[in-house]
């Protein structure tokens, strides 16, 4: 699938959930943004940072591989940008990311996101909600005679 079609499809799926995806002029190298995520995690700001990076890239089409964008996001969620700059320059969190990648590959994961569902296996990539409903209903039939009330 070409990038334009991919992002159109994402926008259609997201629109139903109140999330918009803008057309992407480029695919950013997200490694430094991910290192920033590890920094944010250590400073109690991971969720806010992660959501801000998501919006910056997917909604506002910002280049999350650009250090200035990363620092602007970090500042916006209350992180110390001087300390983050040092961490990024020294690649302090790179070994952690590399270990996570190695662990994922060792366990057979090659795409993000990957969801592991007990009684089924794994589902890779951005899938429609109906895919998960179908899988969970199948697992439910095997593991639970009572239907899940919350699934529509």
Describe the residue ranges of each PLM region.
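Structural alpha/beta surface segment adjacent to cysteine/selenocysteine redox centers
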Residues: 1-60, 147
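C-terminal cap of thioredoxin/glutaredoxin-like
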Residues: 38, 45-48, 52-152
């Amino acid at each position: 699938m070409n990038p334009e079609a991919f992002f159109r499809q994402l926008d259609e799926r997201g629109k139903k959930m109140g999330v918009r995806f803008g057309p992407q002029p480029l695919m950013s190298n997200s490694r430094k943004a991910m290192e920033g995520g590890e920094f944010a995690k250590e400073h109690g700001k991971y969720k806010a940072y992660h959501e801000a990076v998501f919006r910056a890239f997917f909604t506002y089409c910002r280049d999350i591989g650009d250090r200035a964008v990363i620092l602007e996001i970090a500042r916006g969620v209350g992180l110390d940008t001087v300390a983050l700059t040092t961490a990024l320059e020294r690649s302090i969190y790179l070994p952690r990311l590399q270990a996570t990648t190695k662990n994922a590959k060792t366990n057979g994961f090659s795409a993000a996101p990957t969801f592991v569902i007990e009684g089924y296996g794994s589902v890779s990539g951005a899938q429609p909600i109906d895919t998960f409903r179908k899988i969970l209903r199948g697992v439910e039939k095997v593991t639970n005679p009572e239907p899940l009330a919350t699934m529509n």
